[in-house]
Regions:
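Intein/HINT protein-splicing elements and their conserved insertion hotspots or analogous self-processing inserts
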Residues: 1-9, 13-14
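Flexible, glycine/charged-enriched surface loops at secondary-structure junctions
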Residues: 2, 22-27, 128
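Hydrophobic residues within alpha-helices
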Residues: 5, 57-58, 106
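Phosphate/diphosphate-binding loops
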Residues: 91, 95-130, 134-150, 156
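Conserved small/polar residues in nucleotide/adenosyl-binding loops
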Residues: 165-172
């Protein structure tokens, strides 16, 4: 775990690579759905474990800089709750592996109700990447520690990049 804590600087650099320029933020994985994301009237962030905690920070960031209410739910509860989901809803699924069963079930529920689904995960080609409408890979690399330190740092970085992208999109 000590090694992974010290790898966080490289993790952020890898997460930023090709996405952050002095004059712009580039999030190609979201561009096709960005208008729908910005027009949404509510956002749900669903995840498990450490990814859920990243979602809590995402909620604070998004609500501070937008007028959109954000709700963070454990994926295991999201799939059974009577949450208000429709085509004006964005559901962000966060998963380190992209294969967390409860998170995938939450994505399926959101898709069934017509929400725009966005994935944040580390593994290209994972189920979360395939089942969501759009998304961003964290590029944090393999992580051995249970604490998921690098994934947490990368997930928060991606959520912050989304806010920067919003301000870039508003400038156009």
């Amino acid at each position: 775990m000590h090694k992974e804590i010290h790898e966080q600087v490289d993790t952020i650099a890898n997460t930023m690579r090709g996405r952050i320029r002095p004059d712009a933020v580039l999030l190609h994985g979201l561009s096709e759905y960005w208008d729908e994301i910005e027009a949404s009237n509510r956002i749900y962030i669903t995840a498990c474990g450490t990814s859920w905690h990243a979602g809590l920070i995402g909620k604070l960031l998004i609500e501070k800089f937008s007028n959109t209410p954000v709700f963070v739910e454990y994926a295991s509860e999201f799939r059974y709750n009577h949450t208000l989901i429709d085509s004006q809803t964005v559901v962000i699924a966060i998963s380190q592996s992209g294969e967390t069963a409860d998170t995938l079930a939450a994505v399926q529920k959101a898709n069934d109700y017509g929400a725009v689904t966005m994935g944040i995960c580390n593994v290209p080609g994972s189920s979360v990447g395939r089942e969501t409408d759009c998304g961003i890979y964290t590029r944090c690399g393999h992580e051995v520690g249970v604490a998921s330190t690098k994934a947490f740092t990368a997930q928060i970085s991606i959520l912050y990049f989304c806010l920067l992208y919003t301000s870039d999109a508003a400038d156009e």
